[in-house]
């Protein structure tokens, strides 16, 4: 399945950290965490497909689809190295 163009937010500077929210949440659930880390890290939070401001794409979704979406966003932002923080998947 093709990846979707996920809605995302970038704050701060430094090593890249992608924040992946849980099912039923959205990128803004990471706002408080990013606020505390943005002085030392580039914080990238994004809405999973079908959540928040991201399009739904084609149902059903698989874990591979969600990984493909993250990889597409990583490439779009030209990020070579990254850390990933997530919960509830």
Residue ranges of predicted features:
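Alpha-helical elements of Rossmann-like donor-binding domains used by nucleotide-donor carbohydrate transfer enzymes
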Residues: 7, 32, 36, 65-72
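Conserved HGGG/HGGXW glycine-rich cap/lid loop of the alpha/beta-hydrolase fold
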Residues: 9-59
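Active-site loop/oxyanion-hole signature of alpha/beta-hydrolase fold enzymes
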Residues: 44, 48-89
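A generic structural signal for alpha->beta connector loops
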Residues: 5, 40-41, 81
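A short loop-to-beta-strand scaffold at the N-terminal edge of the catalytic core in hydrolase folds
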Residues: 1-10
